[in-house]
């Protein structure tokens, strides 16, 4: 059966709606799910889904057949962030936070599966921390890394964990994939992440994801 002819504007609108819907459903969506939710004919949804998958914007799970956001979307997100001076926007908030709680604060982003500090505000008189702008850290053992990964699609989290592995840095480091996945869900529920001597002995750190504020 021939695919129904759609106007360019309709096709673009449906493509954007599919991407937005995929981003809102962490467990993934099937062709039928998209068709039902967005009121799009299954044949049209199937064509758009295959095209997005071919270009890396969606990925299809071979086990359940559901579609989830692909890594290409993450690349676009990174490009969008680079066009905005995140540090400039965050710095006044960070300074206010330091004034309120008198603890050194950091701003970090996710880059190639690592957490990278892009800004730091040191609290006066506070114990100096061995951190610096540009420092790269593991995502499974740091509070900031957990916060960054927790709000990604589960497929993206799994891909990063597979790529990076779960290195044991202290006796408290989580090195079990099921346990770290549960930890990410806990972060999403609580709204903050904790590093309880998992990256470095003697250090207890808390992090909140600014994107969730």
Indicate where each model-derived feature is located:
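Acidic-residue sensor for enzyme active/binding pockets
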Residues: 13, 20, 53, 119-122, ...
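Short, basic/aromatic recognition patches
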Residues: 90-95, 164-203
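Conserved small/polar residues in nucleotide/adenosyl-binding loops
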Residues: 206-213
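Amphipathic alpha-helical effector-binding/dimerization core
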Residues: 63-163
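N-terminal helix-turn-helix
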Residues: 2-88
